């Protein structure tokens, strides 16, 4: 776990993000979405040239179909899926490619999904 990231996120979540109005929340959300889209344009092969004109929405089927182009870590879907399935069987959740961990969604929709997280992201989730 990244302790500095954990502490920073915990402090921000606990003491610094107090919104006084709906407008303040919406402004914060817009800023965060802009930052996220800038990140995707820089890091995700799928979004390098912006949002495609035919892009409608993101669901599990779309994400799994375009996993290799969407993810920002260069992780191959088939490799990650094999590792995640093996990890589920053995209960050995070894990381893939350094700090990237792989997991599976429960598959309650009938289709299992794949997710990857970095050590930084896991620290932020734990703190929030």
What residue spans do the PLM features occupy?
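Nucleotide 5′-phosphate-binding alpha/beta core
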Residues: 1-104, 110-127
């Amino acid at each position: 776990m990244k302790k500095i990231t954990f502490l920073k996120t915990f402090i921000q979540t606990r003491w610094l993000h107090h919104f006084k109005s709906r407008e303040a929340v919406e402004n914060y959300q817009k800023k965060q979405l802009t930052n996220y889209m800038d990140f995707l344009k820089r890091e995700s092969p799928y979004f390098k040239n912006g949002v495609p004109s035919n892009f409608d929405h993101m669901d599990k089927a779309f994400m799994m179909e375009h996993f290799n182009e969407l993810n920002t870590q260069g992780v191959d879907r088939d490799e990650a899926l094999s590792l995640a399935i093996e990890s589920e069987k053995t209960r050995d959740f070894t990381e893939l490619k350094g700090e990237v961990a792989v997991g599976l969604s429960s598959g309650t929709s009938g289709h299992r999904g794949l997710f990857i997280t970095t050590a930084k992201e896991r620290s932020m989730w734990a703190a929030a």
